[in-house]
């Protein structure tokens, strides 16, 4: 019995990314594995792959990307040799279109390429060391396009790259396999714009509909994440489940219902602000305010990422218990439930004593 468990653990440790063929989790992000165990890829290797884009379909996904698309990109990578290590799987191309340098993610780091990452806009770009200056010179153009304070690169000024600062989704389906495999940039025409929307959580910046301050998507995810509550005065919005399990939100009592999903709006806004510094264990995006209940555990999630990572949610409405245990600590919930029940009874007795004391004082 124990030997089979050890073998299973050993096989998990031996799994390698389909792109970089390594276990470099520290450099390349978490190694994500599909449910059928057939596809494995580092999150960063997928985010920066030139022809891979986010998927919002109901089919099984890997870190927000379609399993089918990841497999196609891994297959495309078998024909692309890395400019640094000369091994296949190098699907990350320099974002200067005329440049033929292509990398694995960790090789781009080692070759001192410039990594540009702006999760809030779905922008993930790489400039080889030769074209760093090009990226630096075009930062001002991008800042003007997005009207934000953070500086990110735009592409060099060429006729084909005139649409600056417009993240978009590229649909590669329906193209011949050869056209997807001949270049580290996917297809030339489809990569004529500088930016590729790789974020698993973001839609087009032209979409002005309210988005959840935690998971960054809108009402299209209401079925899975609960109603999207909107607070127009503060220009804030949040899904019910995202608020319910966030570590710092306060749900109001039945006698003082708020208009913002029964939550104290002040605590929701504070949590959204805190979430900007909290990156998700699964997808590495900000807004992950749902932490594992084990104090020594540092795992933190968006609501849907916790579900995808097989974390265990404890939801007991009658007792006001809403907790998450990561998959490594999901066995701790039963013991913790007993502790919580004892604490709840203790709090109930204290409340009754306080009420009796208050009645006695009022009687006097």
From Swiss-Prot:
GO terms for biological process: blastocyst hatching; negative regulation of transcription by RNA polymerase II. At 12.5 dpc it is highly expressed in the embryonic central nervous system and at lower levels in other tissues. Very low levels present throughout the adult brain. The modification Phosphoserine is found at residues 138, 145, 155, 183, 199. There is a cross-link at residues 173, 227 (Glycyl lysine isopeptide (Lys-Gly) (interchain with G-Cter in SUMO2)). SMART domains: PHD. GO terms for cellular component: kinetochore; nucleolus; nucleoplasm; nucleus. It comes from the Eukaryota. A motif (Nucleolar localization signal) lies at residues 157-169. A zinc finger (PHD-type) spans 80-132, 278-330. Residues 209-330 are annotated as: Extended PHD2 domain (ePHD2). Residues 354-364 have a biased composition (Polar residues). A zinc finger (C2HC pre-PHD-type) spans 14-52, 209-249. The modification N-acetylserine is found at residue 2. Residues 157-171 have a biased composition (Basic residues). One of its GO terms (molecular function) is tubulin binding. It is found in: Nucleus; Nucleus, Nucleolus; Chromosome, Centromere, Kinetochore. InterPro entries: EPHD (IPR034732), PHD-type_Zinc_Finger (IPR051188), Znf_PHD (IPR001965), Znf_RING/FYVE/PHD (IPR013083). A motif (Nuclear localization signal) lies at residues 13-16, 129-133. Gene3D superfamilies: Zinc/RING finger domain, C3HC4 (zinc finger). Keywords: Acetylation, Centromere, Chromosome, DNA-binding, Isopeptide bond, Kinetochore, Metal-binding, Nucleus, Phosphoprotein, Repeat, Transcription, Transcription regulation, Ubl conjugation, Zinc, Zinc-finger. Interacts with UBTF. Interacts with the NuRD complex component RBBP4 (via the nucleolar localization motif), the interaction mediates transcriptional repression activity. This is PHD finger protein 6.
